[in-house]
Swiss-Prot record:
Gene field: tsf
Organism annotation: Psychrobacter sp. (strain PRwf-1)
Keywords for this protein: Cytoplasm, Elongation factor, Protein biosynthesis
Gene Ontology CC: one annotated term: cytoplasm
Protein name: Elongation factor Ts
One Gene Ontology MF term: translation elongation factor activity
Disulfide bonds: none
Location relative to the cell: Cytoplasm
Length: 292
């Protein structure tokens, strides 16, 4: 067997997107023949799936599965909303959610190892779907919520909510889930707002207040007002109710005898930064490469 040079490994890596060890192994199997190595990798599906893995998957779908007193929200990402509506993508996302819930796991690494059926793991099924559809597809995150009274709502493919509550009418939970989908609260009550978020908002309110140049006693009131305004926007019971904006959610809950125990809200692509193409820079780079 001829020695595989680093240059050959780099060439195969650049052309397939695979890791160095996979490229070296593929080249060893073909005695350094790059084209044959690529053909072999394409036949096995590795090259295409690995190349797509470098693409940013910021679209996708939120799926919800429920069994008894447990429900799961799962986000599966792809690159375009067109693929997010594809039946194969939808089937994969729903099945993965059901498997994760049945195995009571939200760990993405653990989910990838679950038995998908037909002799495949979830990860192997994902790779096969990448090959079939032609986009990067990733299982991003999952959350399980438990409760005797669960209600869910999905707004299109992009937003999913599950609420655990006690009391109220049959449609109380559903209406509440719709409200949470629309207004995106961070907590049920003031005391549930994370301390680090409150501290950050207080710093922002103080910085704005001090720009006014007013006396300290006035600044303190301005800070309190800024925090109060922030809490009105992000705390569920303080928000104007989506079904009747003349009422606060807290007042509606009290009148209906509803207690919110917990909720989970997922929105597709939260926190994922989409790549912004700079076509002028891309053309300039291509011209520079051609000139070399």
């Amino acid at each position: 067997m001829s020695k595989i040079s680093a240059k050959l490994v780099k060439e195969l890596r650049d052309r397939t997107g695979l890791g160095m060890m996979e490229c070296k192994k593929a080249l060893e199997e073909t005695n350094g023949d790059v084209e044959q190595a690529i053909d072999n990798l394409r036949k096995s599906g590795q090259a295409k799936a690995a190349k797509k893995a470098g693409n940013i998957a910021a679209d996708g779908a939120i799926v919800i599965a429920q069994e008894g007193n447990k429900a799961i929200l799962l986000e599966v990402n792809c690159q375009t909303d067109f693929v997010a509506k594809d039946d194969n993508f939808t089937e994969f996302a729903n099945k993965v959610a059901e498997l994760a819930l049945a195995n009571n796991t939200t760990d993405v690494a653990a989910i990838s190892e679950l038995d998908y059926g037909n002799g495949q793991s979830v990860e192997e099924a994902r790779v096969a779907l990448v090959q079939k559809i032609g986009e990067n597809i990733q299982v991003r995150r999952a959350k399980i919520i438990e409760g005797d009274n669960l209600a869910s709502y999905r707004h299109g493919l992009r937003i999913g909510v599950v609420v655990s509550s006690e009391g109220g009418q049959e449609d109380s939970g559903k209406n509440l889930a719709m409200h949470i989908a629309a207004f995106n609260p961070v907590a049920v009550n003031d005391t549930d707002v994370p301390a680090d978020i409150l501290a950050r908002e207080k710093d922002i309110a103080e910085a704005k207040a001090r720009e006014s140049g007013k006396p300290d006693n006035i600044i303190e009131k301005m800070i309190e007002g800024g925090l109060r305004k922030y809490l009105d926007e992000v705390v569920l019971v303080r928000q104007a109710y989506v079904m009747d904006n003349e009422k606060k959610v807290g007042d509606v809950l009290k009148a209906d005898g509803v207690t919110v125990k917990d909720f989970v809200r997922f929105e597709v692509g939260e926190g994922i930064e989409k790549k912004q193409e700079d076509f002028a820079a891309e053309v300039a780079a291509a011209q520079a490469a051609a000139a070399q």
